[in-house]
Design a protein with these regions (language model features):
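Residue-level micro-sites within transmembrane alpha helices that shape
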Residues: 21, 31, 101, 107, ...
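Short amphipathic helix-loop junctions that connect adjacent transmembrane helices
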Residues: 3-7, 149
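Transmembrane alpha-helical segments of integral membrane proteins
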Residues: 140-149
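Interfacial/gating helices of multi-pass transporter permease domains
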Residues: 6-24, 92-98, 126, 160
Length: 188
C-alpha cells in the first residue's frame, strides 16, 4: 500500500524508496542477526532459569545494537548524499534520496532496539506481544502516510510515517518487555 502512495509522486520516488531501503537494510539486517542470536541465547538460558545470564547478554546485545544504530544514524543523516550517489547518480533523484536517508536515519537506534526486543520476546516463547505491536504500528504507516502526504511534506510524508512508526515501536516494545520480564521473575 505504501508503494501505491509513493507511486503518485512518480517513478523517481519509487526508485528512491527501493534504493534507499536497500541502503538502510544494512542496519536492520545486522540488527536482525543480533535478534536471532539473542533469541537462541535467551531461550537456552530461560530453559535453565539463568536470569542473570539473560540480563547480561541482553545488556551486551543492546549496547551493540545501539552502537550499530548510532553509526547508521550518523551515516544516513550526515553522509546521505555520497552514500546515495554510489547507487544512483541521476541529479533529479539525489535530493529525494538524501531526504529519504536522512528521515529514515533518525529512526535507526529505535529500530535496532525494536528488532532486538522482538528477539528477546521470541527467546521467552512470547510471540503475541511483539506481533500485535508490530502489526498495529506497521499498519499505522498507511494512514500516517496518507495524512502526511496531503500536507506540504509530499512524498517525505511517507518517509516520516515509516520513521515515526519505527521510533514508536522501538519505544513501546522495551516497556512491554520490562513489564513481561517483571512478571516472569515474579512467577519464577
Amino acid at each position: 500500500m505504501l508503494a501505491r502512495i509513493i507511486s503518485h509522486f512518480g517513478a523517481t520516488e519509487i526508485a528512491v524508496q527501493k534504493v534507499g531501503s536497500q541502503i538502510e537494510s544494512l542496519s536492520w539486517i545486522t540488527a536482525d542477526g543480533f535478534a536471532i542470536a539473542l533469541c537462541a541465547f535467551v531461550g537456552q538460558n530461560f530453559g535453565s532459569r539463568n536470569f542473570d545470564r539473560i540480563d547480561k547478554g541482553i545488556r551486551i546485545i543492546a549496547m551493540m545494537s545501539i552502537f550499530l544504530g548510532a553509526i547508521a544514524t550518523i551515516g544516513l543523516v550526515f553522509f546521505g548524499e555520497p552514500i546515495f550517489r554510489v547507487f544512483i547518480d541521476e541529479p533529479q533523484s539525489i535530493p529525494s534520496g538524501v531526504n529519504y536517508l536522512r528521515i529514515l536515519g533518525y529512526s535507526q537506534i529505535p529500530m535496532c532496539i525494536e528488532i532486538i526486543t522482538i528477539g528477546m520476546f521470541n527467546g521467552f516463547g512470547e510471540t503475541k506481544i511483539p506481533a500485535v505491536i508490530s502489526i498495529l504500528l506497521t499498519g499505522a504507516r498507511i494512514p500516517m502516510a496518507l495524512f502526511f502526504t496531503s500536507t506540504a511534506l509530499g512524498v517525505n510524508g511517507v518517509w516520516w510515517a515509516i520513521s515515526l512508526s519505527s521510533i514508536v515501536k522501538g519505544s513501546i516494545l522495551p516497556v512491554f518487555y520490562y513489564l513481561y520480564r517483571k512478571k516472569m521473575v515474579l512467577e519464577a
